[in-house]
Design a protein with these regions (language model features):
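C-terminal regulatory/oligomerization modules of transcriptional regulators
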Residues: 1-8, 129-146
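Charged, amphipathic alpha-helical coiled-coil/dimerization segments
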Residues: 27, 77-136
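N-terminal leader segment of winged-helix/HTH proteins
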Residues: 1-37, 84
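Short helix-capping/turn signature of helix-turn-helix
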Residues: 50-53, 114, 142
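N-terminal helix-turn-helix DNA-binding core of bacterial DNA-binding proteins
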Residues: 28-68
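Residue-level marker of regulatory loop/turn positions in helix-turn-helix DNA-binding domains and
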Residues: 11, 39, 50, 101, ...
Length: 146
């Protein structure tokens, strides 16, 4: 059996630090674009999830972001006021509101995405396809807690 050196504490600590730095750099790339709208990281996280899950309701968004309703309300108010997102009442349950990117939000998100895309694209382009597939698999396992 192989000696699993990558499972030693020092290696795991290094992976955690690298994940932190990768997150920090990727999410700081659009800082200038966000600041023009007076948005911050919380706005970006909400926009990312709404863009990737059109029609997500408030409860699902709270669950995915792992935040309180109170902390999310300010962010959503900002995004609605600036016409980035819109709320549409659910057809089956009118108490629920589904969230979508509005036209302005789609344009803004694309601008933000393009600032982040460069870093990710270059990293993927400079890696083998096998490495990319394995890395994606590891990330999914981290997200799913396996």
């Amino acid at each position: 059996m192989k000696n699993l050196l990558y499972l030693k504490d020092e290696q795991i600590k290094e992976f955690i630090q690298l994940l932190f730095y990768a997150y920090r750099e990727t999410f700081s790339d659009p800082k200038e674009v966000l600041s023009k709208k007076f948005f911050g990281p919380a706005h970006l996280r909400a926009l990312n999830l709404i863009e990737g899950n059109p029609g997500i309701n408030l409860g699902e968004l709270i669950f995915k972001l792992k935040v309180t309703k109170q902390s999310l309300n300010r962010v959503l108010r900002d995004l609605i006021k600036s016409k980035m997102i819109k709320q549409i009442k659910d057809h089956n349950d009118t108490r629920k509101k589904n969230l979508f990117l509005d036209k302005e939000g789609k344009i803004f998100f694309e601008t933000v995405y393009n600032t982040q895309k460069k870093r990710i694209f270059n990293a993927l382009k400079n890696s083998s396809s096998d490495s990319v597939i394995k890395f994606k698999d590891v990330l999914k396992k981290i997200v799913n807690g396996r």
